[in-house]
Amino acid sequence: MSDKKRVLVKFSGEALAGGNGFGIDTHILKYIAGEIKGLVLNGIEIGIVIGGGNIIRGVSAAKDGIIKRTSGDHMGMLATVINAIAMREALEYSGLSVRVQSAIKMEAICETFIMGRAQRHLEKGRVVIFAAGTGNPFFTTDTAATLRAIEIDANMIIKATKVNGVYDRDPMKFEDAVLLNEISYERAMEDNIKVMDDTAIALAKDNKLPIVVCNMFEEGNLLKIANGDYTNCSVVKN
């Protein structure tokens, strides 16, 4: 591994939809590309995982029993590939060098995930977008992001959301909701605090990988966090 900081950023698929609620908003892509470029220009190596909820969710697709859960999850994996290609285009348009690596082999579209190759791309200053989740049904893209972060020896995983971090209650419903600046892995799981799913948190805990939850729409926020400024976000760690 290089001596540079290495961060994995996780975006939800819904974030790409903007106010539309579905599909991909190119204005959001352009904004995210600008934030990622700021990280790269400051010498930070970047991996990215994007969910697929702006297109389809495996659980939702399978809820009435017509589509099997495994098939629904495979559809969700393909949705993440669509988002990864869109993000690659936006990042390349901004002048960055980018590679997409998929957990499912699809050579005509992108590389297949190989840990060593991904690390070499990062060392050369390329942004690597990891698509298709873990390649297995029943695992979320949060778990996939945590797994890839560990595999590439990332210093942290940043979960970029629409809110400043994790609250003791839903800030959209309760005006007195309090931002939790620091939480232990154990509390996040025991209190069912919606940071990530329990599998992802447990994996991060076992590998001492900090999870930082932040507002992606605060300009420059990702760079501040990557440089150690956690004043307006939530950090999950031991």
UniProtKB/Swiss-Prot annotation:
Catalytic reaction(s) noted: UMP + ATP = UDP + ADP
GO cellular component, one term: cytosol
GO biological process: 'de novo' CTP biosynthetic process; UDP biosynthetic process
Ways its activity is controlled: Allosterically activated by GTP. Inhibited by UTP.
Binding site for UMP: G52, D73, T134, G135, N136, P137, F138, F139, T140, T141
Region (Involved in allosteric activation by GTP), start-end ranges: 18-23
InterPro entries: AceGlu_kinase-like_sf (IPR036393), Asp/Glu/Uridylate_kinase (IPR001048), Uridylate_kinase (IPR011817), Uridylate_kinase_bac (IPR015963)
Keyword ATP-binding: yes
Transmembrane parts of this sequence: none
Chain positions recorded as ATP binding sites: K10, F11, S12, G13, G53, R57, T161, Y167, D170
Keywords on record: Allosteric enzyme, ATP-binding, Cytoplasm, Kinase, Nucleotide-binding, Pyrimidine biosynthesis, Transferase
Domain of life: Bacteria
EC number: 2.7.4.22
Any one GO molecular function term: UMP kinase activity
Compartment(s): Cytoplasm
Entry annotated with the keyword Transferase: yes
CDD domains: AAK_UMPK-PyrH-Ec
Subunit relationships: Homohexamer.
Protein name as it appears in the record: Uridylate kinase
Organism: Campylobacter fetus subsp. fetus (strain 82-40)
